[in-house]
Amino acid sequence: MSAQAYYELYRGSSLGLSLTDTLDDLINEGRIEPQLAMKILSTFDRVITEVLADKVRTRLTFKGHLDTYRFCDEVWTFLIKDVNFKLDNQQTISADKVKIVSCNSKRPGEA
């Protein structure tokens, strides 16, 4: 069984940051080894990617002013200002700034 590499994007989410903080605390207290923490984070990367791809079906549209965009290492980054999101249920949510990171579902070089 070959280990597929997953992007680590979701480690920067509130859930990922909480997990990382908790793992750091456990390492500092000597309750787990750093290698176990890395295995847990790798599992988190895989599971959150699979769950979001399989379970999330809500659609939204958004409109805003594109401030900055970048394309580096097969990853697009968009910084958008004055954004309005419109959800499936017609609810509207506004934000001053939004950062969108978009990458291929497969890493470069993967079949």
From Swiss-Prot:
Keywords: Nucleus, Transcription, Transcription regulation. Gene3D superfamilies: Transcription factor IIA (TFIIA), beta-barrel domain, Transcription factor IIA gamma subunit, alpha-helical domain. Transmembrane segments: none annotated. Disulfide bonds: none annotated. One of its GO terms (cellular component) is transcription factor TFIIA complex. GO terms for biological process: positive regulation of transcription initiation by RNA polymerase II; RNA polymerase II preinitiation complex assembly. InterPro entries: TFIIA_a-hlx, TFIIA_b-brl, TFIIA_gsu, TFIIA_gsu_C, TFIIA_gsu_N. It is found in: Nucleus. Pfam families: TFIIA_gamma_C, TFIIA_gamma_N. Signal peptide: none annotated. GO terms for molecular function: RNA polymerase II core promoter sequence-specific DNA binding; RNA polymerase II general transcription initiation factor activity; TBP-class protein binding. It comes from the Eukaryota. TFIIA is a heterodimer composed of the large toa1 and the small toa2 subunits. Belongs to the TFIIA subunit 2 family. TFIIA is a component of the transcription machinery of RNA polymerase II and plays an important role in transcriptional activation. TFIIA in a complex with tbp mediates transcriptional activity. This is Transcription initiation factor IIA subunit 2. It comes from Emericella nidulans (strain FGSC A4 / ATCC 38163 / CBS 112.46 / NRRL 194 / M139) (Aspergillus nidulans).
